[in-house]
A protein has these predicted regions:
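Conserved alpha/beta-hydrolase
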Residues: 48-70
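Short, well-ordered alpha-helices that flank and scaffold nucleotide-derived cofactor binding pockets
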Residues: 44-47, 51, 116-117
Length: 222
């Protein structure tokens, strides 16, 4: 696996991982990681796919890993439309006009939007661990805000994990956690894995705070 930085792409210096076993590969696969992950997450899959003759590219997305913003970031830069543009512009700079997309977790969301916004570029789309329900509506955003308030009203209080990770204190809490960052991340990924015995999927009866409180604590935090 080779690594490189592609400079001046939609305001970013993009760090990518790349594999290719053929001089003139017929197909490119772009792999987009989720949260909290990096392009490194795809290292084994990239090698497997490259042995099948595919040219594989996995970037660290905006805000992750070794990818750096050229100027100070604005919150608006992280809109789903701009995150999709990041990848489109990256592939355009690499002179790759058509490609397969594989997205995992939040990378699935970005991949789905790329497919909607730039369908002329997409050969195929594969998404994992995050179903795509279509473009978000304002009503859905308002509903999420209501759910977060209802979670706070529960006893004990709860927080949705996305709400927590976007709060001001989250970074400091994680970086300075009692067990150390490495052990925190190892535990976090283990608790979300198939190997963890208490992970038993079930369907929620409704989109309400009381139902969501039944979810594992790495999703709905006490």
């Amino acid at each position: 696996i080779k690594t490189k930085v592609i400079k001046n792409v939609n305001g970013l210096n993009f760090f990518i991982r790349e594999t290719c076993t053929e001089k003139k590969p017929s197909n490119t696969i772009v792999l987009l990681h989720g949260f909290p992950e990096l392009s490194y997450s795809f290292r084994f899959l990239m090698i497997l796919l490259s042995k099948q003759g595919y040219h594989c590219i996995a970037p660290d997305q905006r805000g992750y890993g070794e990818t750096r913003s050229i100027k100070k970031e604005k919150t608006s830069n992280f809109s789903i439309v701009n995150l999709s543009k990041d990848i489109f512009e990256l592939l355009k700079k690499l002179k790759i006009n058509k490609y397969h997309l594989i997205g995992h977790d939040f990378g699935s969301y970005v991949s789905s939007y790329i497919t909607l916004l730039y369908p002329q570029c997409i050969i195929s789309l594969t998404i994992m661990s995050m179903p795509f329900g279509g473009p978000s509506k304002k009503a859905n955003i308002n509903k999420l805000a209501t759910i977060n308030q209802e979670l706070r009203n529960l006893k004990p209080k709860r927080k949705h994990y996305q709400y927590y990770f976007s709060s001001k204190g989250a970074e400091s809490n994680i970086m300075n956690c009692r067990q150390g960052l490495k052990n925190f991340l190892r535990s976090y990924f283990h608790f979300k894995s198939y190997d963890y015995p208490h992970n038993k999927p079930f369907k929620l009866a409704s989109f309400t705070a009381s139902e969501m409180a039944k979810m594992p604590e790495y999703y709905i935090i006490k």
